[in-house]
């Protein structure tokens, strides 16, 4: 098992603000902000959502320490139990599911035969996770204020972002930049050269859920306002989904492009199409 606290840092980026990027000054409702449809309830604090290419939906069910699978026909089952505070969830190119344990400080892989293997340990409240184009696992290592990039085959890690404000979500963009949502109030784009662009001025409190939307924008949960925003790199922030019951936390994308949102308080997963 890999003990990340004892690992030497392979690569650390230095950060500098991007002076030439626009500040976030434009805030608006989307052209057609949508009202979500409740698909499923009975969860206990759904925190992460990932969708397999075959349409199977996986939900990290924080309050029950389980990972739930919802088949295309709606059948639900627990594929993993006893995970302390399961948070982020991601599926690799082979269809293998990975989950972060926020309270256990580890990342676990769910193997095709139903067994599970810890691939990295001794993290610092790992929250949102996502795969990079290179197949590395990106981890929002919340308590350490950093983003890690982990080789899922051996658990070796490197720090790719530091000095963040309680990062809870991360996604990679087509240009190789990373965007991270932070519970401390920031949404930050980190370019490959280490420079940063702040995008979160319109947020009440960014949440775990974050997804890319094309090459130059992201969908992000605004946990403090119970809605989903779309933030583009040109400085525009728009409300795209509102009207949730409970506190929006998780964000996933269905195979048809609809957004899936998990809410705390009501223990539900919602679906909403995005109107352009």
Show where each model-derived region lies:
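A short loop-to-beta-strand structural motif that recurs across blades of beta-propeller domains
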Residues: 66-69, 105-109, 146-149, 186-188, ...
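Short loop/turn segments immediately following the C-termini of beta-strands
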Residues: 62, 102, 142, 182-183, ...
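Blade/loop signatures of beta-propeller domains
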Residues: 21-34
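Beta-rich, blade/repeat-based domains predominating
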Residues: 41-54, 82-94, 105-106, 122-136, ...
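Bacterial N-terminal signal peptides
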Residues: 8-23
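Short loop/turn segments that connect beta-strands within beta-propeller blades
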Residues: 70-75, 110-115, 150-155, 190-195, ...
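A short beta-strand motif characteristic of beta-propeller blades
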Residues: 35-40, 75-80, 115-120, 156-162, ...
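Conserved beta-strand element within WD40/beta-propeller blades
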Residues: 59, 99-100, 139-140, 180, ...
